[in-house]
Amino acid sequence: MLTLLLCLAALAVSASSCTGGKNEADDPTRVRVGIVFDIGGKDDRSFNAAAFEGVKRAERELGIVLRDVEPGNPTSIEPAMRAFAERGYDLVIGVGFAQAPIMEIVAKDYPHINFAIVDGVSQLPNVASLVFKEHQGSYLVGMIAARTTRTGKLGFVGGMDIPLIHRFATGYEEGAKAVNPNISVYRNFVGVTDSAWNNPGKGKELALSQIGKGADVIFTAAGNSGLGAFDAVEQAGKGADGRATHFVIGVDSNQNMVKPGYVLTSMVKRVDNAVYDIVNDVKNKRFQGGIHVFGLDKDGVAFSLDQYNQPLIDPSVLQEVEAARQKIIKGEIQVTDAMAK
């Protein structure tokens, strides 16, 4: 059965979207990288998309051979990883915490293959764990939300109800309450299984429920499900002044352009940079396993500011948030890490 799965995965690897000819994957002179996305897919305009941006940049700038797999369901992840490892790829990347236990199993069987897991942790020497201080970036967007709300009520829509997503929610609430201790923050989660990342209908339903309670700024950390919150704030419409009455805060990648005028900002995780850097390390033969942490100090997390949202945020708010960012970096502000509880 395993042989059959490996064969099927190998076919998926061969047919995956990538550039280059058929024989490039067998070119021993070039670094070969395989990436396995989570079930949200690389076009989720969020977490997976950020990882894809990183490997595509590596393909352009470093001349690697890139293959990717978008598993239709979680059972396809392990065979895909094994297919890359069996072919002797120089680096196998897994996207998302849910892949960490799977990679732990596969990486043990291929100790001479380099692996990297985004948002997961492994103690194996051939696995690089790429993790982020999401709570720090979430604190900053919480401050922006608190300075923007007219109702004193905020919302948070998470994907899967897990400690990682509580890290976003807790940082967001602490940042908001640093501005206004009396502010209300409603929290809801799409679900408790992997499907929670790919249910925009449920995401919209939760966001509309929070809007019904008075929330006028909603932060979403829910993968593809979060796009439903974008639809919800757009549905709420604009006021007489032509300004949106409700805003959403995007996550992972810059989502400001998804619904221009309705996206207050995005809490960006520079997954693209982390993935690019680990590919570059492999190319330059300096790969190191272990935990690689990306926080505000390394620009691993940030909030996005561009032509789409700059008119929505007062310069005085940006100054206040920048001051807080510096204090977090210096350790003068300690943001609670929900995963460390």
What annotation goes with each model-predicted range?
Residues 1-5:
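Bacterial N-terminal signal peptides that target proteins for export
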